[in-house]
């Protein structure tokens, strides 16, 4: 076979088979010997092609028109799905048997043939499945056959609305049973909702304090709060302008303020959460006008920077110095000016001892004249004092102990109080107010003799005298 064709022939590679008419893969002399060769071997040769009958088709001949394969493929839907499609496609959600046939043949060309077979299956499925309900025809609409529709409980028999998969075979009794079970489960929940609503309406909730009521505290209105009998009978200490001393004052003076302040503080502490405690309530109360005579809650009066037990705040006026019944009430200053000593350097100089009382009195007086006559915000950290005459200083045995507590450092740092801005004392954080209320009410010991007994660590110096102008009161 290799000797019968030329290797040097350009057509031997099979690239261009139809270059010449007299040359082919096989020589003409041997043409008759290869009549039995298969067609793929002779399709490139004119001489070999002529030896075969004309009915032999070429490999690349044109195809005759054939029907598309997709038209003849059976749809992947069951007969139940086909009937459901026809019913849901109708405007009235009901269709006759002939309408089902027409819908299926229009949508799926596969069912255009062999009508007898699949139409019989459609009728069987309509009769045997409970999901299809037969509806009699009305007399007003003449025609042949009855309508078929879907049972209302069978609309969800296909998964996610896809007709390719059905959940399960629909049965009317199962559907009714499921409906009853759902009704039993939903009944308690429906009954519980109205009862809960009635309980909410019958039990009035505690309404929080409105911001409008808080902001108009300066004289028009005050936030609604329950007034306890103790708060309604708050004693008022006489003006310090008079020469009467604290110990010889009214029966509601310093010796009796400890029990009164603690009791009222406890009651106010329990009443505070009912008002809707908020930061706005704190700040607006701190910014209260001196012309209003409102009481401060223990969380506001608590001296957060000194660790002293918070006491009951008293009424005040611009012409009277705010004298708060703090346990530290034995210090004495003979002055006629309105003074409120803050938690700064010259306030600590009150405890230097009896030998320096004269010098300290003049220093504190000159410094406090620059301060306002009233200061609500600074009273949270103030050390209240009683205005006793200088002649009564020596009669108090506590001055020696106070001098030993404060290490006689107040004389050296007393002059620093004038340069310390009072405005920096007016901004206390909310955390300090809460901490002072918690620590002050529970941990600070108070002596019945009105002596200032503050719990400081004995191993650390009380005050720093290394030239620091700011004293960290919240350190302790």
UniProtKB/Swiss-Prot annotation:
<dbReference type="GO" id="GO:0007507">
    <property type="term" value="P:heart development"/>
</dbReference>
<dbReference type="GO" id="GO:0071910">
    <property type="term" value="P:determination of liver left/right asymmetry"/>
</dbReference>
<keyword id="KW-0539">Nucleus</keyword>
<dbReference type="GO" id="GO:0030325">
    <property type="term" value="P:adrenal gland development"/>
</dbReference>
<feature type="compositionally biased region" description="Basic and acidic residues">
    <location>
        <begin position="173"/>
        <end position="188"/>
    </location>
</feature>
<dbReference type="GO" id="GO:0040036">
    <property type="term" value="P:regulation of fibroblast growth factor receptor signaling pathway"/>
</dbReference>
<dbReference type="GO" id="GO:0035469">
    <property type="term" value="P:determination of pancreatic left/right asymmetry"/>
</dbReference>
<feature type="region of interest" description="Disordered">
    <location>
        <begin position="284"/>
        <end position="303"/>
    </location>
</feature>
<feature type="DNA-binding region" description="Fork-head">
    <location>
        <begin position="74"/>
        <end position="168"/>
    </location>
</feature>
<dbReference type="GO" id="GO:0003682">
    <property type="term" value="F:chromatin binding"/>
</dbReference>
<dbReference type="GO" id="GO:0048387">
    <property type="term" value="P:negative regulation of retinoic acid receptor signaling pathway"/>
</dbReference>
<dbReference type="GO" id="GO:2000583">
    <property type="term" value="P:regulation of platelet-derived growth factor receptor-alpha signaling pathway"/>
</dbReference>
<feature type="region of interest" description="Disordered">
    <location>
        <begin position="169"/>
        <end position="271"/>
    </location>
</feature>
<dbReference type="GO" id="GO:0006357">
    <property type="term" value="P:regulation of transcription by RNA polymerase II"/>
</dbReference>
<dbReference type="GO" id="GO:0060059">
    <property type="term" value="P:embryonic retina morphogenesis in camera-type eye"/>
</dbReference>
<dbReference type="GO" id="GO:0001756">
    <property type="term" value="P:somitogenesis"/>
</dbReference>
<keyword id="KW-0805">Transcription regulation</keyword>
<dbReference type="GO" id="GO:0030500">
    <property type="term" value="P:regulation of bone mineralization"/>
</dbReference>
<dbReference type="GO" id="GO:0072015">
    <property type="term" value="P:podocyte development"/>
</dbReference>
<dbReference type="InterPro" id="IPR018122">
    <property type="entry name" value="TF_fork_head_CS_1"/>
</dbReference>
<dbReference type="GO" id="GO:0008045">
    <property type="term" value="P:motor neuron axon guidance"/>
</dbReference>
<feature type="compositionally biased region" description="Polar residues">
    <location>
        <begin position="217"/>
        <end position="233"/>
    </location>
</feature>
<keyword id="KW-0238">DNA-binding</keyword>
<dbReference type="InterPro" id="IPR001766">
    <property type="entry name" value="Fork_head_dom"/>
</dbReference>
<dbReference type="GO" id="GO:0043114">
    <property type="term" value="P:regulation of vascular permeability"/>
</dbReference>
<dbReference type="GO" id="GO:0061300">
    <property type="term" value="P:cerebellum vasculature development"/>
</dbReference>
<dbReference type="GO" id="GO:0043010">
    <property type="term" value="P:camera-type eye development"/>
</dbReference>
<dbReference type="GO" id="GO:0000978">
    <property type="term" value="F:RNA polymerase II cis-regulatory region sequence-specific DNA binding"/>
</dbReference>
<dbReference type="Pfam" id="PF00250">
    <property type="entry name" value="Forkhead"/>
</dbReference>
<dbReference type="GO" id="GO:0001944">
    <property type="term" value="P:vasculature development"/>
</dbReference>
<dbReference type="GO" id="GO:0007368">
    <property type="term" value="P:determination of left/right symmetry"/>
</dbReference>
<feature type="compositionally biased region" description="Low complexity">
    <location>
        <begin position="240"/>
        <end position="259"/>
    </location>
</feature>
<dbReference type="InterPro" id="IPR036388">
    <property type="entry name" value="WH-like_DNA-bd_sf"/>
</dbReference>
<dbReference type="GO" id="GO:0039021">
    <property type="term" value="P:pronephric glomerulus development"/>
</dbReference>
<dbReference type="GO" id="GO:0051216">
    <property type="term" value="P:cartilage development"/>
</dbReference>
<dbReference type="InterPro" id="IPR047391">
    <property type="entry name" value="FOXC1/C2-like_FH"/>
</dbReference>
<comment type="function">
    <text>DNA-binding transcriptional factor that plays a role in a broad range of cellular and developmental processes such as eye, bones, cardiovascular, kidney and skin development. Acts either as a transcriptional activator or repressor. Binds to the consensus binding site 5'-[G/C][A/T]AAA[T/C]AA[A/C]-3' in promoter of target genes. Upon DNA-binding, promotes DNA bending. Required for cell viability and resistance to oxidative stress in the eye. Promotes cell growth inhibition by stopping the cell cycle in the G1 phase through TGFB1-mediated signals.</text>
</comment>
<dbReference type="GO" id="GO:0033339">
    <property type="term" value="P:pectoral fin development"/>
</dbReference>
<feature type="compositionally biased region" description="Polar residues">
    <location>
        <begin position="284"/>
        <end position="296"/>
    </location>
</feature>
<dbReference type="GO" id="GO:0005634">
    <property type="term" value="C:nucleus"/>
</dbReference>
<dbReference type="GO" id="GO:0009653">
    <property type="term" value="P:anatomical structure morphogenesis"/>
</dbReference>
<dbReference type="InterPro" id="IPR030456">
    <property type="entry name" value="TF_fork_head_CS_2"/>
</dbReference>
